[in-house]
């Protein structure tokens, strides 16, 4: 049986933190492939300005091209309407594939507010990594609660903390600050060519 990881996000823009998480997940969980899933129209981003999906797709594709075992899917950006995680998992789930959905600890804290959370937890192994602002105590407490309620096993991915965020990168670009220690040079080139993250 193939072991596929799915890492979703707006990737606006993709940065070294995303690549590090995917690399460590692939290595630690012995995954055959990690699929990057740029979000099309995510419900939790409604009302927020998000870069055109095709440009975000292009940035992700460029960023992962030299990594073996990384791939990209346009499933969510091609979808009409909102992109729900349970639909994405249903699309990729089959008898020959075991799915690992990789997400931040913040998502575990509010997983029950997600559309059809029970379906999500039944379709995949939920893999969470700690991000800034979440104590291990709170994470463990929520992990135990979800595991008991839904009879699932949640995997906590031990990672070195990288304080990189797409929001901070966008602000730095708008302020004409350097971001080449956060973002691959090839992605900076695409950002510059398309004049992204500069306020009108």
From Swiss-Prot:
Disulfide bonds: none annotated. Pfam families: CTP_transf_like. It comes from the Bacteria. It is an enzyme of class 2 (transferase). Pathway: Cofactor biosynthesis; NAD(+) biosynthesis; deamido-NAD(+) from nicotinate D-ribonucleotide: step 1/1. One of its GO terms (molecular function) is nicotinate-nucleotide adenylyltransferase activity. It catalyses: nicotinate beta-D-ribonucleotide + ATP + H(+) = deamido-NAD(+) + diphosphate. CDD domains: NMNAT. The keyword Transferase applies. One of its GO terms (biological process) is NAD biosynthetic process. The keyword ATP-binding applies. Its EC number is 2.7.7.18. Keywords: ATP-binding, NAD, Nucleotide-binding, Nucleotidyltransferase, Pyridine nucleotide biosynthesis, Transferase. HAMAP family: NaMN_adenylyltr. Belongs to the NadD family. Catalyzes the reversible adenylation of nicotinate mononucleotide (NaMN) to nicotinic acid adenine dinucleotide (NaAD). NCBIfam families: cyt_tran_rel (TIGR00125), nicotinate (nicotinamide) nucleotide adenylyltransferase (TIGR00482), PRK00071.1-3 (NF000840). This is Probable nicotinate-nucleotide adenylyltransferase. The lineage of its organism: Bacteria, Bacillati, Bacillota, Clostridia, Eubacteriales.
């Amino acid at each position: 049986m193939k072991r596929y990881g799915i890492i979703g996000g707006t990737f606006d823009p993709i940065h070294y933190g995303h690549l590090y998480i995917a690399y460590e997940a692939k290595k630690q969980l012995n995954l055959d492939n990690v699929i990057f899933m740029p979000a099309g129209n995510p419900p939790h981003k409604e009302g927020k300005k998000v870069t055109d999906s095709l440009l975000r797709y292009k940035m992700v594709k460029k960023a992962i091209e030299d990594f073996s075992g990384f791939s990209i899917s346009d499933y969510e950006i091609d979808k009409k309407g909102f992109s729900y995680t349970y639909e994405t998992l249903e699309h990729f789930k089959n008898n020959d594939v075991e799915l690992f959905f990789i997400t931040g600890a913040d998502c575990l804290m509010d997983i029950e507010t997600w559309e059809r959370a029970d379906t999500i937890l039944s379709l995949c192994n939920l893999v969470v990594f700690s991000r800034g602002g979440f104590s291990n105590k709170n994470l463990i407490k929520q992990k135990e609660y979800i595991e008991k309620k839904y009879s699932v096993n949640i995997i906590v991915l031990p990672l070195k903390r990288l304080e990189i965020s797409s929001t901070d990168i966008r602000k730095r670009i708008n302020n004409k600050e350097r971001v080449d220690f956060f973002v691959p040079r090839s992605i900076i080139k695409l950002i510059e060519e398309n004049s992204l993250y500069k306020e009108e």
